[in-house]
Amino acid sequence: MNLESSNLKISSERLDLAEKDLRTVGFHIFENVITAEDADKAREATLALAETEAQNGKGSIYGEDKIRRVWALVSKGTIFCQLIQNPTVIAIWKRFLGEDVIASTFTANIVGPDAPAGGWHIDYPYWAMSPPFPEGSLTGQTVWMLDDFTPDNGPTACIPNSHKMLRPPKPGEAEKHQMAVATAPKGSILFTNGAIWHQCLPNTTKQPRVGLLGMYNRSVIYPQEDMPRQLTDQQLENQSDMLKQLLGRKMQFRDPENGINWRRTETGFDTHDAT
């Protein structure tokens, strides 16, 4: 399945605004990054994949068994390989996280009917770190809206400026702050600073709310998923350099004893093309 629509060309002014928002309030919404038709294609593929995994006893279910997560999307469809390297997404994260940005995870998040709130939290690697967190940008989350995100169907909510606290929220603390609810038409993206306090709100509708979560790191931060193994060496042969970079296949590991550099493969390490 391919996305047929052309991606938006992002201006330097819009990049400036996105970066400013991520560093100040902690989030930025970019509407209509892909068309509604392409969002429908991705939604259909996501729901079909989730159903297959459920039948096979795979995937992850939480939130009173009403929220479903599908992991390792890059390995599960061409459409996901396209979305993870969307030019608008890459332009924003290169600006925020550096030219050598890598992917940490790419997953599906399906908030089913009557699902509860997801609970206030921060994203990896911050939840694996002891506060206070270092200042600056380590990671960012990309929330692909494959449905219209409305106030009632489980949208993402953020506490503006909370990333500046440099720590996770204490129990009951986030509720004392004014939250911002991310609503936008399908095909849009919510970009968030990885340290911001956020959660999905309850879905009080009768339809599932489908989104994709793409997390991107500075290259010095170890990814949450084992991204280099999501595609085989053969599958990667004709893929873009950008996808190879995102999967960590272009990172070099120095072997000083032998005077060579290693790179990750699907099964381990190799010196192929490493200089």
What kind of feature is each model-predicted range?
Residues 29-30, 144, 190-192:
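Short hydrophobic-aromatic micro-motifs
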Residues 116-183, 221-231:
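Catalytic core of non-heme Fe(II) oxygenases with the double-stranded beta-helix
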Residues 105-108, 142-144, 212-216:
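A structural signal for short, well-ordered beta-strand segments
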Residues 35-36, 109-111, 149-151, 163-164, ...:
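Short, solvent-exposed loop/turn segments at secondary-structure junctions
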Residues 1-25, 31-130:
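Non-heme Fe(II)-dependent double-stranded beta-helix
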Residues 165-191, 195-196, 201-275:
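Conserved double-stranded beta-helix
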Residues 66, 76, 104, 138-140, ...:
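Residues that flank catalytic or metal-binding motifs in active/ligand-binding sites
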